[in-house]
């Protein structure tokens, strides 16, 4: 690790170039998770129903690794040369080679955001546990943000994994002490849980989902209980302002469900930046 730190300090251009490339590669994989995980969960749910009803529907194997990447329109396998992060999308001008249908801008956008996030983390931390942890946390938050926007779901497979990883990283006090991390996880979950039930009791409506509780618990495990007030404040204010402006411009129904996960993720990024500056 000391050698890698020395390399980063002696050859910053090479180091940040490598981080940028790593960000593009990881971003490409994050797109796979964003696309496939909701489908995997739906298939699992359908299989559970089939087991209860006794109606079996043979299903092909489907996970993050299989089948190989294919065109979302015609299902033709994507060649390796057309699967290079960002550059393939730009080279093909946002269209698939096989059927010339448009490919969502989400794919290059996620890759670019991941690259920029990795570069920003590299500015805050030298190579070490804190940097690797920051890259993992930022990657999870980006995936959760996009999935929540698209499906209004924050899968347990991601939120609970993120929570346990936060505790593991803080076993050695990478970001905060283990005591602060454990208290942060409990406080994060209970604070939104209490808010949920208080609002439901007062209005009869549900303002949050259980996935939000688990995501805030995970952020508490990474950043400690001290970060939670500012984190929630940033999430609430950014969510309120942007949502009011967005719905006002689009004249959307105010009763339409709102994904709160992305705003918690923004609060988590804010908390991570403050941790990086030791504020």
Swiss-Prot record:
Gene Ontology biological process terms from the UniProt entry: methylation; signal peptide processing
Positions on the Cytoplasmic side per record topology: 36-104, 150-163, 205-214, 255-257
Reactions performed catalytically: Typically cleaves a -Gly-|-Phe- bond to release an N-terminal, basic peptide of 5-8 residues from type IV prepilin, and then N-methylates the new N-terminal amino group, the methyl donor being S-adenosyl-L-methionine
Chief location bin: membrane
GO-annotated molecular function: aspartic-type endopeptidase activity; methyltransferase activity
InterPro entries: Peptidase_A24A_bac, Prepilin_IV_endopep_pep, Prepilin_pept_A24_N, Prepilin_peptidase/N-MTase
Name the record gives this protein: Prepilin leader peptidase/N-methyltransferase
Source organism per UniProt: Pectobacterium carotovorum subsp. carotovorum
Source lineage: Bacteria, Pseudomonadati, Pseudomonadota, Gammaproteobacteria, Enterobacterales
């Amino acid at each position: 690790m000391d050698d890698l730190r020395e390399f980063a300090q002696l050859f910053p251009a090479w180091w940040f170039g490598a981080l940028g490339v790593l960000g593009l590669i990881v971003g490409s994989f994050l797109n796979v998770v964003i696309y496939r995980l909701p489908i995997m969960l739906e298939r699992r749910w359908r299989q559970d129903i089939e087991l209860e009803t006794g109606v079996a529907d043979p299903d092909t194997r489907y996970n993050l690794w299989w089948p190989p990447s294919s065109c979302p329109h015609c299902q033709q396998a994507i060649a390796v040369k057309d699967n290079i992060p960002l550059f393939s999308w730009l080279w093909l001008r946002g269209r698939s080679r096989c059927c010339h249908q448009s490919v969502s801008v989400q794919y290059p956008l996620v890759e670019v955001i991941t690259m920029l996030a990795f570069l920003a983390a590299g500015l805050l931390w030298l190579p070490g546990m804190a940097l690797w942890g920051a890259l993992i946390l930022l990657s999870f938050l980006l995936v959760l943000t996009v999935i929540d926007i698209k499906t209004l779901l924050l899968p347990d497979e991601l939120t609970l994994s993120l929570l346990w990883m936060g505790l593991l990283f803080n076993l050695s006090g990478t970001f905060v002490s283990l005591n602060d991390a454990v208290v942060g996880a409990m406080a994060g979950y209970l604070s939104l849980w209490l808010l949920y039930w208080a609002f439901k009791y007062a209005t009869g409506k549900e303002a949050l989902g259980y996935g939000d509780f688990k995501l805030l618990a995970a952020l508490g495990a990474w950043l400690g209980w001290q970060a939670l007030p500012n984190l929630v404040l940033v999430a609430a204010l950014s969510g309120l302002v942007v949502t009011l402006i967005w719905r006002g411009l689009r004249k959307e129904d105010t009763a339409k469900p709102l994904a709160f996960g992305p705003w918690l993720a923004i609060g988590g990024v804010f908390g991570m930046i403050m941790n990086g500056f030791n504020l």
